[in-house]
Amino acid sequence: QAGRTIRYNLKYGGDYRFMSFRSLLLSGNMVDTQFCYHELPEKLDPFDNETFMHSKTKFYAVCSNVETGSPEYVLCRDMFKDIDFLRASASMPFVSQIVKAGGMKLLDGGITDSIPLTAAFKLGFERNIVVQTRPEGYRKKPARTGWLAKMFYGKYPKFVEAIKQRHLMYNRELDEIEQMRAARRVLVIRPSRSVKIGKMEPNPEIVREMYELGRYDAIAVLDSVKKFLQGDKNEKG
């Protein structure tokens, strides 16, 4: 469904239910659950779940278990039935309610495993492509939300600690990626330049700019991607 994501982002980005503080106040979630995870993919801009279910490609959602402070890697076979895991994987702390799914309490997987490359190798995937959202040289700084994490998630001390230590985990994963990239074990695609875009960017022009940059950078490395997936160990990205 090429173009679907940018299409619905631009079409519905101005709807308060899509992402807004108004939605947070009314529903407890910055991203309205019913609208974004049911009405939109089921009716307004239907997701082709039939093709997804018959695809040979495995799709995993990475979620953070707030009770254990560890990541959960959930194989999704039916996007409509497994939608709560997908929702949890994108539910940012502080602006989302904890998602209960599979007997677990879950939030954004990026808190406990921001770039799950090691997990991909452990799951048996040998030729991995890492798509980064930050340009080369980026390093994550310590967050100033430790006190907020304790206030929101005091019942879950391991998750609070994961939030406090996230920058260390993230930068360690960046180092591991560079080592694997140098050894030609992974191919890395990253933005060719910086774009000032917020996590909850409301400006459609900036969203479009980021999308077009992603397309441009992907096309630029397409031949390298093909060679890498075909097993050319000399291909370095």
Label the model's feature ranges.
Residues 1-43, 75, 80-88, 132, ...:
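Patatin-like phospholipase
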Residues 14-24, 64-70, 158:
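Acidic/polar active-site rim loop that often engages polyanionic ligands
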Residues 23-31, 70-74, 104-107, 161-164:
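Flexible, glycine/proline-enriched loop segments at strand-loop-helix junctions
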Residues 31-54, 168-176, 190-193:
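C-terminal domain-closing interface element
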Residues 46, 113-114, 174, 204:
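Structural motif corresponding to alpha-helix initiation and N-cap regions
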Residues 53-131, 135-150, 231:
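Active-site gating loop/helix substructures
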Residues 126-185:
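Helix-centered, glycine/charged polyanion-binding patches within enzymatic domains
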Residues 173-237:
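C-terminal helical/tail subdomains of lipid-metabolizing enzymes
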